[in-house]
Structures are given as C-alpha cells and as structure tokens.
Amino acid sequence: MGPLLVWHRGDLRLHDHPALLEALARGPVVGLVVLDPNNLKTTPRRRAWFLENVRALREAYRARGGALWVLEGLPWEKVPEAARRLKAKAVYALTSYTPYGRYRDAKVQEALPVPLHLLPAPHLLPPDLPRAYRVYTPFARRFLGVEAPLPAPEALPKGPEEGEIPREDPGLPLPEPGEEAALAGLRAFLEAKLPRYAEERDRLDGEGGSRLSPYFALGVLSPRLAAWEAERRGGEGARKWVAELLWRDFSYHLLYHFPWMAERPLDPRFQALPWQEDEALFRAWYEGRTGVPLVDAAMRELHATGFLSNRARMNAAQFAVKHLLLPWKRCEEAFRHLLLDGDRAVNLQGWQWAGGLGVDAAPYFRVFNPVLQGERHDPEGRWLKRWAPEYPSYAPKDPVVDLEEARRRYLRLARDLARG
C-alpha cells in the first residue's frame, strides 16, 4: 500500500496541524492541495495571495524532504484521483465547519475509495458547540484557556511531487507569503504592539493591530498558536487580542448553526428594510466617492492595499447599511472580495454586527457618526491625509446623503420593523 494523503484546505501550514501529525504517526505522507474552482472565483488579489501561500507550503514540504501535490479541479474528483494514483491508504484533513466545506467533504467521502479522517481543527472554541449562541459573551464564557499548540514536523518522508502552481498578478503588493513570514509577523507583534493593543487597537490606520489576518484567513498561521503565545506574555493587551481571536470562532459558530445568515439577516425582521437598488449610490460607496471622509478613505485604502483596520471596516459597512440602505448582501460580498483576508464567516458576522442585523447584542439603533469616529480614532488626521487628501478634516463635503437625515430615516424604519 502507498502513503497517507494529508489534504490541506484552509490550513496552509505545517505547525499546529493535528491531521498531519496523526497521519505521520501512522506512516509516510504526501501533502495535497486542490485548486478548487469554487474557491478561486474571486478577485486576482485573493487568488494570487492563495496561490503564493500554496507555493510557500510546497517549499516548506520540500525543505523537510517531503512532497506536496497540487491538482486543479473539483475536490470530489481530484482527491479520489490522487488517492488512486498514489495507492493511498487513507486521507487525513482538518474539519471544515462552513456550509460549502461540509458539502464538499461529504461528496469527497462518498467518492473516495479509502477512508477520509477529519480531525478537529485547532480553534480556541469549536464552532460546532451543540448549543447555538447568537450572542458573543455567553459563547466566550465557554473558553477556559488555550490548549498547547502542536509542533511542526522537523522532517517529512520523501515522496513524488505532482502539479504546477499557476501565477497570478495581484495588481497590488502582497505581504510575504508562508508560515515562516506569518510566525515572524506574530513575534514582531507580540514584542512591539501587544503591550499597548488594548489602547491602540481602534486606530483607523490599523497600526495598533497585528495585521496577521491575511495569514489567519488561509490557515497559514494557527490561531491556537497565536493565542497561546499571547497568553504566555499576559496583560490586558493579550486578553483583548485573544478575545478578538475568539470573535473569529464565534463567526464560524454562527455560520455553522445559522447557514442562512449568508443570504438574509440573522434577525429576519430587518430583511424588510427598503433596500435601495441604486447603482450610482453603490458605486459612490464602493469607489470611495461619498463625500464622507472616513468612508471614502476606508474604501480607497481597501482598493489600494487589500487591508483595512477593524474600526474602518465597521464604519464603512455601517454607513452602507444604515445611512445608504444599500443591499447589505451585495455590499458584503463586494467588500469581501477586495480583502486579502476575505473570510466569508468573519465578514458576514462583521457586516451583520455593524449593520445591526441580528449578530450579538449590537442594537439596531446604534448608528456611528463618521465625523466623530474619524476625529476620535485618527485625531491628527494622518490616515485621512494619506487616503483622502482632498479633505482637510472629517467634516463631510457634498455628501451623497445628509448624515443626520439619513440617520433619522434609518432609525424610523428600523424601529417600525423592530416593533413588528
């Protein structure tokens, strides 16, 4: 019989990988990545970021003496094909909790000539907790501490290599791909920024945060390892940052238990908001031409870099939903495809939270003032000057809507729906 296949999906790394270590304990392994067309229907920047991290994973296999197969096609065709060609005894992978991941894995299992072993992915809290939580705080109370992460293997058995990894022009500069770069970025954040994270995490320029989200999105960096290292250092910054990592797991938990939240609000009452199918208004928001400085700076930075701070994301999303009443699902999807860290579960949670559509205890009647938000979280205006230099301050300039009138309109509509 041949080797064991380790199928990498949203876990493009060797460290803290239970499926890889379990397979290695049972025999020689060959790694596998399938370039799934269902996941590659996105922007060039996101395809390029994914492909460069697959390339880095192959180099990590090679550096340890191992081999990574890369096949292009549907997983329920290509995983069985790889298993047959290698005469593999079994396939090992980490559990996926997304609706598509569960569908894909069921189809692969049905088509495979050998067993598919799915091991728990190293989340801080498993997304498939039996009780379905809609509010973050009781979910987070289930967290009792971080389990120790697993080490990366020092060596891998030799094996055949198969498949080419295509190149894609991202159209913008990418971060350094691969887990070595991710681990270096983690160390730099823990040493330089974690001590002040609690005070600086809301900066609009994102310089108070880790900027590790593109690595988390592809599983290049294990959140369990990141939380473990943060907790070792301790302090209020570590506590706050681990809480943010728990929000990621809460996002997966929500989508696991409420898969329909990808199509409609978690609170169904707000589906009936009079969404504005206004193409000119959508383009103004999407392209950063609203006349509202914070929103315009946010969308321009996102287009130029593929990154945006959490505070800027919340403001851009809430403005689209509450001030403009743009169809939230269209905006969420367009926004996600610009993000290098575009993660469906995380982005859906973020948009439904910011939009007051039923996630967590965020009240629908909370409406950010983008002028005050800018002045509070970019007090010297440096971020604004970089991304929207035509604005001398955070005061609107010929805005597409009057901020106060739009706020009152939304509150009137939302209150009527909330009262039933």
Curated annotation (Swiss-Prot):
An example Gene Ontology biological process: response to light stimulus
CC cofactor note: Binds 1 FAD per subunit.
Stretches for region Interaction with DNA: 244-251, 310-311
SS bonds (residue pairs): none
Enzyme class (EC, first level): lyase
Similarity comment text for this entry: Belongs to the DNA photolyase class-1 family.
Entry protein name: Deoxyribodipyrimidine photo-lyase
Source species of the chain: Thermus thermophilus (strain ATCC BAA-163 / DSM 7039 / HB27)
Lineage: Bacteria, Thermotogati, Deinococcota, Deinococci, Thermales
